[in-house]
Amino acid sequence: MDVVGCISLLVHTSLTLAAAFLVYWAFKQRHPAAPPCIGGCIPWIGASLRFGKAPLEFIEQARQECGAIFTVVAAGKRLTFVTEEEDFEIFFKSKNVDFQEAVQEAVWRTASISRKSFSKSHTAVHDMMKWRLGPSRLHLFCSNLSEEFHECLMHLGTKGTDDLYNLVWHSMYSAVVNNLFGRGICPTDRNTVKEFEEHFQKFDSGFEFGSQLPECLLRGWSKSKHWLLSLFESVVAKAENMKPADDDSKTLLQHLLDTLDGNSTANYSLLMLWASQANALPITFWTLAFIISSPFVYKTIMKELCSVFDDQGSKKVEIKETDLEKLPYLKCCILEAIRLRAPGVITRKVVEPLTIRNYIIPSGDMLMLSLYWAHRNTKYFPEPEKFLPERWKEAVIEKRGFLDGFMAFGGGRYQCPGRWFALMEIQMFAALILYKYEFTLLDPVPKESPLHLVGTQQPLGPCKVEYKSR
């Protein structure tokens, strides 16, 4: 390219950047009643670099600097955060915000479910899951799940040393999948699970980035996503061929396929698998880690378990739903772990201009609420950074109540439909493994990673444990 050509290109590039900046500046000026805005020198990128380094810490720093409501411009999106409890009802109940619009793009990027397909089936799928996994039907899962957990724990032997997160993952995954999908439907046995496990863990670990970025920037993650989608074509076919006539004998996957009626079945099935693993397994890890690390809590838990199942840890027990009701302190521990390691953010899309306090939030903004920080409100949770299961004695646990200020399962029309099943499976697994084995921590309990906004917080480092049969 000659000198004239280089100068022409430079001038063109400069004018383009200048025009983009003017458009960005003008956009900000059109909203004089908008909340304080954190952006950057480059219009599309905005605060992405600062936000991405440690998003959880960034949110709290921004709240301290800007106040209760503020907007972050990042990666071409406007993220408006509400951080005070008096504004949360607007987040959950306003007709000017929409959950489905907020998550549709992420569903497309992670599972290739089109807007049309999502709009057609999402509400029906949610309502089916909510009913099938509701409190009145949990007894249908208990016996089989208890047996599956027993079988998985047999592989641990009588003693060993392992990273606690890996131990939980390998002990829970196949049991829950066999329970919800049907035995032999998904790869779960040790001869076939290795390749699947590699792809699924890569898909899970990259899910947050995959929900936001083009696949061309995440080639390894994209490869695993499409490998899993291809696998689920055969999973769906197998489940359809094995479908029983009796409605109560069908697995949750088979009920999902009935609801979808041919609409993106492999794609929704992959999301169902991810949803069944992505939050319950980390929370089980945190629950066990917090219990084992506190001598008083550990002793109290063991006293409670032995009062229900006697003191013979080697005895095989089948846990029923009525047994779980006799373990309230264990449930307190689970709820406290969920509180401490709640999702970084949940979101709604503003579809009509929204007034919060004296601010006007324009349509198109993503309205954000950080459950992680909401659960550190000292009004509801004194000493919020401490693991204090006793605080949950105030909640009516036997009536499935939660403490005021606790919002881990969301709110409004689309709360987590599998929340009661998740609490049951975590409580059952924790009861079985603590009853069967005595644990010793070899590492301190790790901090949570500050990088995750989607889903339960992940551990920042390893947590090695030693275990032996009781």
Regions from the PLM with identified roles:
Residues 2-115, 405:
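N-terminal membrane-proximal hinge/A-helix region immediately C-terminal to the signal-anchor transmembrane segment
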Residues 25-33, 81, 104, 108-149, ...:
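Cytochrome P450
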Residues 48-60, 312-358, 368, 378:
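Conserved cytochrome P450 K-helix E-x-x-R motif and the immediately C-terminal K′/meander segment
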Residues 139-283:
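Cytochrome P450 heme-thiolate monooxygenase catalytic core
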Residues 253-310, 337, 368, 418, ...:
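Central I-helix of cytochrome P450 enzymes
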Residues 297, 419-457:
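Cytochrome P450 heme-binding "Cys pocket" and the immediately downstream C-terminal segment
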Residues 369-397:
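Conserved cytochrome P450 K-helix/beta-meander segment immediately N-terminal to the heme-binding cysteine loop
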Residues 394-426, 451-453:
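Cytochrome P450 heme-thiolate "Cys pocket" and heme-binding signature region
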